[in-house]
UniProtKB/Swiss-Prot annotation:
Biased composition (Polar residues): 188-234
Disulphide bond pairs: none
Phosphoprotein found in the keyword field: yes
Biased composition (Acidic residues): 28-59
Oligomer status and interactors: Interacts with S100P.
Organism of provenance: Homo sapiens (Human)
Protein name per UniProt: S100P-binding protein
Lineage of origin: Eukaryota, Metazoa, Chordata, Craniata, Vertebrata
InterPro entries reported in the protein's UniProt record: S100PBP
Length: 408
């Protein structure tokens, strides 16, 4: 790779030129402001190599590496531009070199940090040879290198070969899967839909291939699209990316063990039904209107609870208990056993006697919760007292004694 090299003298020489365009000379500078110690090598620039180069040798090496540098140095030798003013020139890339090289301008520096060129100020008439410098330190100090990744056709060939092998493997998988579908009795459309949902088409072979880096995948897909003609490229990159984004879950569900074919068929049917739900053009507004499902008002349904633990009694059983109770009361009246127990005590003793006469499963006479009907299952309607009387007056004779109120 060829890189544009801009010496550090550009920034220093440009900053030292007068603004009014007057000719520049080194004699105009104040010699008291120049420091010869800057020309000496610092600790990091000490010569640590086996070969030392002078400034002329460095210029010759730079001319061999960069033709533009040779052109600029040739103009300097012709006398058009002085060697001290070489820092004010800006190297521009030719149109031929724009594709492979980049040129960077002078490095922005503050006025306090300008570096003086490698010149001697003893005579003040021109530059003199200084101490030989190490080439590596000079290049690191004065040059700005830009590296660009080269285009290697062998890498593209290797990726294309790998893509072809993957596509051949996927084609074999497709043929074997098609035979299995025929054996199971699936129609060709269903098997095709299943394979498309799995992403086992030759165009989507990169999806099932080995996991490469994202840059390699994008590069491989771009190269394969460029090499394939328009007539042989059925789907675009965008459609393939959308298919990949929609079908990874279906791939996993279809690939996992168990009911492989049934789950794959179900997933393919879901994909076909979802793809059929396309936007419908509204004739009135002229806008795209999708399928919308409106839910009506949800009315909660009261769940009726059946009471299975409510004991019900037969009419004969209740009649038997009543007759037993009456006989016990009559016998107690005719022949009382204990007359000093009082009225309440006598009643309690009588009820206990009736309760324990037959068996203890009978309900105690003092318990008034005995019912011979099941509890209502439907919701009871609320009535006012007047409405209830109007509904039940004819069936209950006790309300006949109530006088009729006449409102005048």
């Amino acid at each position: 790779m060829m890189c544009s090299r801009v010496p550090s003298e550009q920034s220093s020489g440009t900053s030292l030129l007068p603004k009014d365009g007057a000719p520049f000379s080194w004699d105009s500078l104040d010699e008291d402001g120049l420091d010869d110690s800057l020309l000496e090598l610092s600790e990091g620039e000490e010569d640590d190599g086996d070969v030392n180069y002078t400034e002329e040798e460095i210029d010759a090496l730079l001319k061999e590496d960069d033709p533009s540098y040779e052109q600029s140095s040739g103009e300097d030798d012709g006398g058009h531009v002085e060697k001290g003013e070489r820092g004010s020139q800006i190297l521009l890339d030719t149109p031929r070199e724009k594709n492979s090289s980049y040129s960077l301008g002078p490095v922005a520096e503050t006025p306090d940090l300008f570096k003086l060129p490698q010149l001697s100020t003893s005579s003040g008439h021109g530059p003199a040879h200084t101490k030989p410098l190490n080439r590596r330190s000079v290049l690191e100090k004065n040059l700005i290198k830009v590296t660009v990744a080269p285009f290697n056709p062998t890498v593209c060939d290797a990726l294309l070969d790998k893509d072809e092998t993957d596509s051949s493997k996927d084609t074999e998988k497709l043929s074997s899967l098609g035979e299995e579908m025929r054996e199971d009795g699936l129609s060709p459309n269903e098997s095709k839909l299943c394979t498309e949902s799995e992403g086992i088409s030759p165009n989507n072979s990169a999806w099932n291939g080995p996991q490469l880096s994202s840059s390699n995948n994008n590069f491989q897909q771009t190269v394969s699209d460029k090499n394939m003609p328009d007539s042989e490229n059925p789907t675009s990159v965008f459609s393939r990316i959308s298919d990949h984004s929609e079908t990874p879950n279906m791939e996993l569900s279809c690939r996992n063990g168990g009911s492989h074919k049934s789950s794959c068929e179900m997933r393919s049917l879901v994909v076909s039904t979802s793809s059929n739900k396309q936007d419908v053009l509204n004739k009135d507004s002229g806008k795209m209107k999708g399928h919308e499902r409106r839910l009506g008002k949800v009315i909660p349904v009261l769940q009726t609870k059946t009471r299975t633990n409510v004991p019900t009694f037969s009419q004969s059983n209740l009649e038997q208990q009543k007759q037993l109770y009456l006989r016990s009361v009559i016998a107690h009246i005719e022949d009382p056993e204990d007359t000093n127990q009082g009225i309440s005590g006598e009643l309690c003793a009588l009820m206990d006697q009736v309760h324990h006469m037959q068996h203890s499963k009978w309900q105690h006479p003092s318990d008034l919760t005995t019912r011979n009907y099941a509890r209502r299952q439907k919701h009871l309607q609320r009535y006012s007292l007047t409405q209830w009387v109007d509904r039940n007056m004819r069936s209950h004779h006790r309300f006949q004694r109530l006088p009729d109120f006449s409102y005048s």
